[in-house]
């Protein structure tokens, strides 16, 4: 292993762009925005040994690989292990969810790779740890350009407002308290996917940026939201609910922040999801250890600002990170409450299965630590078909048109990154 001062080493993106083009399987997990507690490490990893494509229960299959993971001689949260994603639809292995809608594209339930080359950036310590063979890396060159052309849209304004109205009937009838309904745009894509990531990291820097490449499939995201982190048997999650756009200037920005924090609708929705997160952690944590040390504060990103809370607990000794995954998946912030009923309503009202949207992207470390972000604010590229996808939380007093515009606010950075309006 080599150690370098971060000031003498190229940025994670500059290094990754030299690596990505030479390998079919590679990943960049980059922290470049948001609060320091979320943005400490960046990880570059690639594999010369292929990857795992999972068409069955991801937790059962990944558990079979945990015992064989080799600990890498590097500090930080990721000490070698598995990097990848889990699709939203994998929840059917853990909850009784109806199977009514077609897939938008052909995605497996999960894909993971075990990297044999790893570079870790510790932004707090100012060091770069290299556990990789860089002799096989070719020249860097420039990032290519790309072209997109509109393909289709799932749930236009009228259709989305209609399903929001239908979901309000479920809420008023007492079936659920909240449901998160999503919609998407798709485009025909040609060119260099890395250019999308380059644009996105400039437009919408976030603590959970990622670029995962599995041959002809890519997940390119700038998620603000952690699904969970396990570090030394402490489990953390940071539910986000309640959103406003950023203001044109400081005065307008503060006005929108105060409007958000004074909104009874947004606060009620947020508290509901904090309770859901507490309940999820309670399934796998030692009784009495689940706490909310920070309740309802605002975090600001390039295009939006959110209400956030922190929920923690101590993991029971008989459980591991994959148990935490199945207990928390999918996040209440992308499904609703109660979760199983909300997800069945999603399956009824949305036009397609979600695939990797609203699933999870991250890693399981060989020492038992793990970190997964929610796959939102993400472009999903499957061969030539590019999808951008966003949802809004519907509660008792939701206005259908306002919820439509919330999805558009959440899509704004992605639309800018791919050059569409």
Swiss-Prot record:
Keyword terms of this UniProt record: Allosteric enzyme, Amino-acid biosynthesis, Aromatic amino acid biosynthesis, Lyase, Magnesium, Metal-binding, Tryptophan biosynthesis
Enzyme class: lyase
Binding site for L-tryptophan: 31, 207-209
Cofactor: how bound: Binds 1 Mg(2+) ion per subunit.
Cystine connections: none
Keyword Nucleus: no
GO MF, one annotated term: metal ion binding
Known catalytic reactions: chorismate + L-glutamine = anthranilate + pyruvate + L-glutamate + H(+)
InterPro entries named among the record's database cross-references: ADC_synthase (IPR005801), Anth_synth_I-like (IPR019999), Anth_synth_I_N (IPR006805), Anthranilate_synth_I_arc_typ (IPR010116), Chorismate_C (IPR015890)
Biological processes, Gene Ontology terms: L-tryptophan biosynthetic process
Pathway membership, UniProt: Amino-acid biosynthesis; L-tryptophan biosynthesis; L-tryptophan from chorismate: step 1/5
EC number annotated for this UniProt entry: 4.1.3.27
Residues annotated as binding chorismate: 242-243, 357, 377, 391-393
Cofactor(s) annotated in UniProt: Mg(2+)
Membership in a protein family: Belongs to the anthranilate synthase component I family.
UniProt-recorded name of the protein: Anthranilate synthase component 1
Organism for this UniProt entry: Saccharolobus solfataricus (strain ATCC 35092 / DSM 1617 / JCM 11322 / P2) (Sulfolobus solfataricus)
Gene name of this polypeptide: trpE
């Amino acid at each position: 292993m080599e150690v370098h001062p971060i000031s003498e080493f190229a940025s994670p993106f500059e290094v990754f762009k030299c690596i990505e083009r030479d390998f079919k399987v590679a990943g960049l997990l980059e922290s470049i925005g948001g609060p320091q507690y979320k943005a400490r490490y960046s990880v570059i990893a690639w594999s010369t040994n292929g990857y795992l494509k999972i068409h069955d229960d991801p937790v059962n299959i990944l558990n079979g690989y945990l015992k064989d993971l080799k600990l890498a001689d590097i500090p930080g949260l990721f000490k070698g292990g598995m990097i990848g994603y889990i699709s939203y639809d994998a929840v059917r292995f853990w909850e009784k969810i109806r199977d009514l809608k077609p897939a938008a594209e052909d995605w497996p339930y999960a894909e993971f790779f075990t990297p044999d080359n790893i570079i870790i950036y510790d932004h707090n310590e100012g060091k770069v740890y290299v556990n990789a063979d860089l002799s096989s890396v070719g020249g860097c060159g420039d990032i290519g350009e790309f072209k997109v052309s509109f393909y289709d849209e799932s749930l236009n304004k009228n259709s989305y407002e209609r399903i929001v109205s239908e979901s309000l009937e479920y809420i008023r009838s007492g079936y659920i308290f909240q449901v998160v309904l999503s919609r998407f745009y798709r485009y025909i894509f040609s060119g260099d996917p890395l250019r999308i990531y380059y644009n996105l990291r400039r437009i919408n820097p976030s603590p959970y940026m990622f670029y995962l490449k599995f041959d002809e499939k890519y997940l390119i995201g700038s998620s603000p939201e952690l699904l969970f982190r396990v570090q030394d048997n402490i489990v953390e999650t940071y539910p986000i609910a309640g959103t406003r756009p950023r203001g044109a200037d400081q005065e307008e920005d503060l006005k929108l922040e105060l409007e958000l924090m004074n909104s009874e609708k947004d606060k009620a929705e947020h508290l509901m999801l904090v309770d859901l997160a507490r309940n999820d952690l309670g399934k796998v944590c030692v009784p009495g250890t689940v706490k909310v040390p920070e309740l309802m504060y605002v975090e600001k990103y390039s295009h939006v600002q959110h209400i956030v809370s922190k929920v923690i607990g101590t993991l029971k000794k008989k459980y591991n990170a994959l148990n935490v995954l199945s207990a928390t998946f999918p996040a209440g912030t992308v499904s609703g409450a109660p979760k199983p009923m909300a997800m069945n309503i999603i399956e009824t009202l949305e036009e397609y299965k979600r695939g990797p949207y609203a699933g999870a992207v991250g890693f399981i470390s060989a020492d038992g630590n793990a970190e997964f972000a929610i796959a939102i604010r993400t472009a999903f590229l499957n061969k030539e078909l590019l999808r951008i996808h966003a949802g809004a939380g519907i509660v008792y007093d939701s206005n259908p048109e306002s919820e439509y515009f919330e999805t558009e606010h959440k899509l704004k950075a992605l639309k800018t990154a791919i050059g569409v309006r």
